């Protein structure tokens, strides 16, 4: 019952922070759209978020021009920390407009999971828990950016004004952390859906392997026993292939719903990572109050944050590998089934034609250059794969090196 408890808690928190009005009914294994008063509560909370946003940004950045001790690097570092807050406008509008679509897709996914007995296993659960643990680095980084001694929030230009602003600044920091939680929920939801999809693909691949084993024990000579066995395998394959097509459509629709949020999250994370790595270099190179343990701690926090982003990409790469594994096993099934001596209207011939169509479909889906055959995953700009995250990492390092050279020329 652990998975039911975790799902129930997950959606309870999402309702508490006003992200959606979905409720998971563990007794019926489906999602329910809670209406009044849940909708009223969520709408009021979202309106409050929108109204508070400009005031929170002003409170957290209003001291930029009044901090004599804050250098340019420190100011930029603090302002970049707040860029993620601007994406919440896209997040909330998209989730609320498409909440009925999410409700339908979520129930379709739960049906597929329960058809395979909904036993996700330790690997899937551990992946989601590890992703959640790594996501906490976002909150640590934001808190560190807003509360360190050289932050704009802690500017000491006017001590009396600072004391008067402390309650408002504390409230603004809590607001910023809630906004990070909202955006983290989107990334986590996409990740959980992909993990569940990968688990379903593993079970479907196992089903194909069982068909291969059944086909191998059938008599080689054409006759009634072989024909009856082929009819059963053909019926099982049709059912399995419908589930494969449905799963492919579900995963694509989930990504389509959240693609703009994922795009803006990745864009702000890209800028965020450059600022964090550059700030780490500034601290190691120029800080007069340098402490080795602080440098190591900052490095660990940055690496944790970056690994969390890599996990977001790698789950899509794992999904591709699972489809490739399914493709290979379907090819093996076709090889064993194919025989030139079969009658045109036999179940074996029909199964071969069905398998050939499936092989063409998956080969087209899994081409190395997806631009030729389909839209890329995220707004038609790039694919979520290990290649993309490696390019992103190289770009981050390159930009930091360029900034370091500029800093040396200007301040070195």
Swiss-Prot record:
Glycans are attached at residues 158, 203, 337, 386, 391. It comes from the Eukaryota. Keywords: Cell membrane, Glycoprotein, Membrane, Receptor, Transducer, Transmembrane, Transmembrane helix. One of its GO terms (molecular function) is taste receptor activity. It is found in: Cell membrane. Disulfide bonds: none annotated. It is a multi-pass membrane protein. GO terms for cellular component: axon; dendrite; membrane; neuronal cell body; plasma membrane. The keyword Phosphoprotein does not apply. The chain crosses the membrane at residues 39-59, 72-92, 173-193, 224-241, 262-282, 296-316. GO terms for biological process: monoatomic ion transmembrane transport; sensory perception of taste; signal transduction. Belongs to the insect chemoreceptor superfamily. Gustatory receptor (GR) family. Gr10a subfamily. Probable gustatory receptor which mediates acceptance or avoidance behavior, depending on its substrates. This is Putative gustatory receptor 58c.
